[in-house]
Amino acid sequence: MPPKVDPSEKVEVFLRVCGGEAGAMSTLAPKLGPLGVSPKKVGDDIAKATQPWKGMKVSVKLTIQNRIAVPEVLPSASALVIKALKEPPRDRKKEKNIKHNGNIPLEEICKIAKTMRFKSLAVDFKGSVLEILGTAHSVGCKVNGKSPRDIQAGIQSGEIEVVEPK
């Protein structure tokens, strides 16, 4: 039998859930049971925290200390790009492999790049913007009415200047 977990110890658990849904408690139980946390209550907390991300898959970091779980949403770059499109939530059970065809301004891409900077492997901010533009290309949307690939080429050639938002 594994040793008992110290309740005052800080434990972090990472989960991938669909936004706004409580999820299957049976998948949470093996992870949270030994920590002395109720999977049902945690599932409800996660559903509340992920409500703005309804219909999208997002990562959630659960910080558990003294039998209290605090959920923190860690959206991926693609989730931020899709949210910037301001599309209505879709039923993910009925529609699969959705291509998004909206338009995002470059300033919004810069804001997303600033948000994702801590995860980025790029040396400078310009590299982070290029990463987010690649994500926008894979999502299938346009940036300033053009293909994200064209914007990337413009940034690399120096035609388009990228400024970090304050």
Curated annotation (Swiss-Prot):
Coiled coil: none annotated. It holds the Pfam family Ribosomal_L11_N. SMART domains: RL11. Keywords: Ribonucleoprotein, Ribosomal protein. One of its GO terms (cellular component) is cytosolic large ribosomal subunit. One of its GO terms (molecular function) is structural constituent of ribosome. The keyword Ribonucleoprotein applies. One of its GO terms (biological process) is translation. HAMAP family: Ribosomal_uL11. Belongs to the universal ribosomal protein uL11 family. This is Large ribosomal subunit protein uL11. It comes from Dictyostelium discoideum.
